[in-house]
C-alpha cells in the first residue's frame, strides 16, 4: 500500500519532533489518473478529521508550546539513533549559526516513526528481499535515491549534488500491474535540512470531504499551516527557515485502499556522473524541497515492488502543488549525467489563500493547478466549488485554444488567438483543467478566457503556445510513429507544479524565440495582465527525442553536458502519464541534452529580449528561466507587493508569522524563488539575525552593518529597486484611534491655550476693574438736585468753565486741545439756543402786555405792526431769524410800554436771561457771532434726563450729575442715588414771587422748600449730607432793592424775621438784601435741624451761578466738606 504525501503546516521539514498525525489515512477509491493537486483554500484533512464524530481519538492532539502555537503529535527526540558514518560535515539546523546557500546541496534528514500494524511491509520481487530498514519506510513517500540495503537514519548526511551517486529506474513490461507509481514529495532546496517523514500511523477510514471546493474566505487551521519563526522562535531549534515547509501526510478522499498494481522496478545503479533526479514542481513552487539521493548506492539490488493506496486529491492551498504523484515509469537515466542542480524554494508567503486583489500578483508567480483528475474526474473550471467533472463532459467541450494550437502547428506560424488568449498557460494534460486560483475561478471573464483543454489521454497535449517556424515544421512533420516517444515527457502545464514561470510581455523580436523545450525544465507561463503591444511567451512543447532543433549546429560533448545540466536543473515530471506510458516513450540522454540546450538558449534569448525591450514593467518580471546555472549572478527580484497580503492579525490562523511587507529588502540567490521572499541561506541568515523580541522595523533601522551593505552593494542584489518600490509603496493605514488621540491632544492643547488666553484676559479685566473700582472709590460723585430753573445746569457750566477748560460738548475732556476744539464747536451750536432765548423773551413780553391786568400799552403806537410781526412768528418752527426780526425786536425793546411790562415779569413766566439777551441784540444779529462764556452761562435750555460731567480739582476726581428739576423729571433721580458723595441742592432765591410752570398756583420758593424736605428725609439719602446752594443772589438783590415785590407778601414770617448776629454781609451789600437772603437760608436750615439725627448735615452757600468767581470760591469751600463726606462714606472718618 502507499500513502499520499502533501505539505502540512505543522509537520514541515526541519521539525523532527512532530511526527505525522495519527488517523489521517482513510481508504481511497481506485486511482485512474494521478495529477497535480487542486488549488483551494478549503478545510484541510486535520480540520475535517477533527469534526468527524466517529473518528477515534488521536494521540497527537495539538499541544501548545511556549510560544502559543500548536504542535501536532507527541513530542519526539529530534536526534536519531542512526547516523550516517559518511557524514562529511556537521549537521546544520535552523537554529544554528550558519546555513549554506542553495547552490550547495544541503543535507536533509529523514525520520522513521513506527507504523504499527496498519501498513503492510514492502514486498520486493526477485531473489533478494527488502532489508529491514525499508520495512518501516512509507512506500508512498519513499525518497528517490534511498539505498535498498540501508536507510539513512535521522541526521544522516547527504552530500552535495556534485558528489551524489546517480540512480536509475528500470520499468518492467507494461503488462505487469502490480505496483502503483512511487510518489515523491516535491521538496525544494535552500534550507539547512529537509525532513521526509517515512510512515503514518493508522487512521480510521470512511472519511470523505463534503466540500472540496474553493473558499476565498478560508484560512487553514494551525494544524495544517502553522508558520514557523527563525531561530526556533516558534518550535524550538529545529524550525526550518522561512520558505521551507514540512512534509506531512494528506488524507485521501476514498472509502477504501485498493491497490492498483503498476509495474515499477527500482534499481539503484552506481554511477559517477549520473543525471540528477527531477522532481516535478521543485522550482517556483511554494512548499517545495528538492530530494537528493544519498551517495554510494548499491546497483546490484534486485527490483523492488512498491504498492500504495489510491491517490485522490482533496484540497490544496492556492499556488501550492505538494501532492504531485511520482511516476516510476520515467525514462531510464544514464549513468554519465551531470551532477544535480537544485533550484531554491520560494518563500512560504504564498501558502494559504490569496486575497482577491492579488489576482495579477498571483498570476506572476505561476498559475496554480486545479483539482487533479482523480477517478477519471477533472475539476470543472466553471464550478466555484472545485467539484470534479467527468472527462466525457470535458470532451464534449472542444477547446478553442487547443484547436488554435493544432492549426498553428500545421501552418507553421502562431495564431493570434493562441498568442493573445490567457488559456495558453491554462491548457492541462491528461484531462486536467487549467489551474486557476479561487478568485480567478469565480470570475466569469477569466473563465471564458481560460477554457478547459483536454488533450488525448495518450497524446500528452501541450499548452497553447505559438511555436517558431522551425518548431512548427518539426511539429507538423512529426509522424505518428514518433508520437509515442513523446509521451514519456508530457507537456508542461500552466500549473505551478511544473515550475511555472510568469508570462513575460516581450517584443516581437523576443517572441521569435518564445518556443522553448517542453521538458520539465521548461516552465509554462501563468496568466499575467496583457498589454496591447506585447505578446505572451508561453512554453511550447518540443519532442524530447528530436535530438536538436532543425538547423541547429552539432553540439560537443561538453556543450551537451552543460545543456543537460541546465535541462535537468528543472523539476522531473513523474507519473503525469504513468498509466499510459510505454517503454517506447523513453528518450535517450543525448536527445534530452539537445532539448535542454534548446530550452536554455531560448530562455536566455527571451531574457535578453525582455531586458532589451524595456516595454514591460520590472515589477511584473521574474527570472527568465529555471535553468539558471550556479555560476550565474544573482537574479534581481521584482519588488514585493506592498499591500497585497493582509497583516498578521488579518490573515486568520494560517498566516501569523509572515508580514505583508518585509522590513528588509530580501536578496535572492540563484535559486528560482517566489515573489514574497527568498528561502536561500543568505535570506535565512538575514532573518535569523533578527532579534525575536523586537519588531522588524526596529531591527532594520538599528543594524548599521546591514544598512551599510544594503546601501553599498544593494544594486548588485536588486536592493535599489526593491527599496525604491518599498519607499513608493503606500504606507500603513493610519490607526483611527491614534488619529483621534492626536486630535484630542490637539484640542486639549488648543483648549489650554484658550484657557490661558482667557485667564490672561480675565486678569487684565480684573486689573482694569480693580483700577476702575479704585478710581470709583476715589471719585467724588456730586448730585445736583433742585426745582426747575433753579440754576443747576448753570452750576455745571461753571464747573466746565473752571475745571474743564471750557465747553466740550456734554462731558468733560482731559485733553486741553480736544477741549478747545470741542468748545468752539459747542459754542457754534449754542448760537441757535441764544437766538431762541432772544425770540422767546420778546414774544413773552409782547404777549403779556395784553394779558396783564391792567394791560400795558405801547409807548409808541407806530410799533404796533412790529408787535403784530412778533406775534405772527411766535409759533413758527425752525425760524431762520431774518434781519427784520432783529429790527422789530430792538425797536420794541426800546419802547417804554414794553419796559413797563418787563417790570411785571413776576406775574408771568419769563426767563431770567431775557434782559441780558435783549440788551445784546446788535451783537447777536451779526452773522459771525460767537457766544462768550457769559453768553453760554446765561443761555437757558430745558434739561431733560441725566447728564454727567467729569472734572478734576487738584487731582481729585469729581463726577457731577445734572438732572431735570421739573416734576415729571424727578422720577429719574433715583438712578443717581447710589454711592453719592454729596447732594448739591440748588435753590433759586429770587423766585419767591414767581410760580412754577407746571402749576400757576405754587410758589417756586415754596416748591423748593418742599422738595428739600423730601430729599432730606428720604431713607435712601439719610446718610448723605446736603450742600445748599442759595442761587440767584443777584436777582434777589435787584427785586428787594426795587421794592415792587415784597417778601412778606409771599412769606408772612419775613415780617417778624430779624437778621441773625452771625450774619456776614457782603461788602457794600444793602442790609435789606442781607436780611432777605438769610431769611431764605434759615427756612431751609429749619427743615434740616428739625428732623436731623446727627448722621448728615446741611451746608448752605450763597451763590450766583452766572458769577464764575463766586462759584470758584464756593466750590473750593465745598471741597473740604466733600472730602470729609467721602471719608465718612467709606467709614474712614
UniProtKB/Swiss-Prot annotation:
PROSITE patterns: G_ALPHA. Residues 935-943 are annotated as: G2 motif. It catalyses: GTP + H2O = GDP + phosphate + H(+). The keyword Acetylation does not apply. Residues 737-761 form a coiled coil. Mg(2+) binds at residues 793, 943. Pfam families: G-alpha. InterPro entries: Gprotein_alpha_S, Gprotein_alpha_su, GproteinA_insert, P-loop_NTPase. It is found in: Cell membrane; Apical cell membrane. Residues 31-48, 391-404, 459-471, 482-498, 515-525, 535-552 have a biased composition (Low complexity). The keyword Glycoprotein does not apply. Its EC number is 3.6.5.-. It comes from the Eukaryota. Belongs to the G-alpha family. G(s) subfamily. PANTHER family: GTP-BINDING PROTEIN ALPHA SUBUNIT, GUANINE NUCLEOTIDE-BINDING PROTEIN G(S) SUBUNIT ALPHA ISOFORMS XLAS. This is Guanine nucleotide-binding protein G(s) subunit alpha isoforms XLas. It comes from Mus musculus (Mouse). The gene is Gnas.
